Amino acid sequence: MDSNFIFGIGAFTAIVLVLAVVILIAKSKLVDSGDITISINNDPEKAITLPAGGKLLGALASKGIFVSSACGGGGSCGQCKVKVKSGGGEILPTELSHISKKEAKEGWRLSCQVNVKSSMDVELPEEVFGVKKWECTVISNDNKATFIKELKLAIPEGEEVPFRAGGYIQIEAEPHTVNYKDFDIPEEYHEDWDKFNLWRYVSKVDEHIIRAYSMASYPEEKGIIMLNVRIATPPPRNPDVPPGQMSSYIWSLKPGDKVTISGPFGEFFAKDTDAEMVFIGGGAGMAPMRSHIFDQLKRLHSKRKISFWYGARSKREMFYVEDFDQLQAENDNFTWHVALSDPLPEDNWDGYTGFIHNVLYENYLKNHEAPEDCEYYMCGPPVMNAAVINMLESLGVEHENILLDDFGG
């Protein structure tokens, strides 16, 4: 046999073997395989073992440890921060908009962005271990305004969600398709739906999704969870944008349907002081406002001075009016005020008009003896939130007295 031929075969075989070794080494480095252990809070009893792969947020959830994630793991909300002491790899560019350089040095990461490739050591907030999942049943799902529904859920009998006023839950949905033409919307709200032909939209979701919603219920309303959900329709100027996935799903729910929630979560809690409380809301930002105000007056029987300032377009967008009227009649320390930015002729409105931050300033804070001493709790559309914050800062209110819920608007 020709020696050159034998040499060629040998060289080819050697190259194949070298390539095979390189591939195996690369696979061991790049491809998740085998079981790994995640040590948690230096507590051996909290450690979990599971197959490598996926993200840390999902890995923890698979073992019943639910870290808050308002965006459902998309990396946009920054809620799912945990401290990764080892095994998490380098911080990713997608995390840097939510994590400061100081936090990064301390090991803080977004758990939805951390790949689970090897064993790791993490530190989680203790309240995470009180979070649970429930399969709830839809009691009702009624329009309260043109684009807002009140979803009322029954918690399984014998269970309770131990939440605080101002807290939120996460709601889950499996892949689904929602046709807007099937929505049950009262005739009084059809004008805008017809004007923009919103009935034509379809929301098709091909994956499991999770979103966060602030609760409108307060802790004494036992056995139920109540949400105010604004449907995220495509903006009129950009009608090709897909409609909101979770809001479309929630709007399609009917009494008797089953819904999975997890919680409770939250940090938008009332301070335990005697300071005056000023609540400012708009749109679906009503939810945490209702929760807080009902809790203060109905459960705690607070004697703090409390006022609520709510902005809406027209009377059609006002809701819970009778509830707040009754609270005002029963509590000398509580007043509430509505400003309509675009009242309809048929509204015959003789109350405040304009944007709520201007109305609050002109009719109350401008002549307040010490606006900087009040506590301000707000939830509404981003434009409203920004306008209110700018107004409060101009009055000398410190950031620690401005509490904002970003979810409800």
UniProtKB/Swiss-Prot annotation:
GO terms for molecular function: 2 iron, 2 sulfur cluster binding; electron transfer activity; metal ion binding; oxidoreductase activity, acting on NAD(P)H, quinone or similar compound as acceptor. NQR complex catalyzes the reduction of ubiquinone-1 to ubiquinol by two successive reactions, coupled with the transport of Na(+) ions from the cytoplasm to the periplasm. The first step is catalyzed by NqrF, which accepts electrons from NADH and reduces ubiquinone-1 to ubisemiquinone by a one-electron transfer pathway. The chain crosses the membrane at residues 5-25. The keyword Protein biosynthesis does not apply. This is Na(+)-translocating NADH-quinone reductase subunit F. Its cofactor is [2Fe-2S] cluster; FAD. Residues 34-128 form the 2Fe-2S ferredoxin-type domain. It comes from Mannheimia succiniciproducens (strain KCTC 0769BP / MBEL55E). CDD domains: NADH_quinone_reductase. Belongs to the NqrF family. Keywords: 2Fe-2S, Cell inner membrane, Cell membrane, FAD, Flavoprotein, Ion transport, Iron, Iron-sulfur, Membrane, Metal-binding, NAD, Sodium, Sodium transport, Translocase, Transmembrane, Transmembrane helix, Transport, Ubiquinone. It catalyses: a ubiquinone + n Na(+)(in) + NADH + H(+) = a ubiquinol + n Na(+)(out) + NAD(+). It is found in: Cell inner membrane. GO terms for cellular component: plasma membrane. The gene is nqrF. Composed of six subunits; NqrA, NqrB, NqrC, NqrD, NqrE and NqrF. InterPro entries: 2Fe-2S_ferredoxin-like_sf, 2Fe-2S_ferredoxin-type, Beta-grasp_dom_sf, Cbr1-like_FAD-bd_dom, FAD-bd_FR_type, FNR_nucleotide-bd, NqrF, OxRdtase_FAD/NAD-bd.
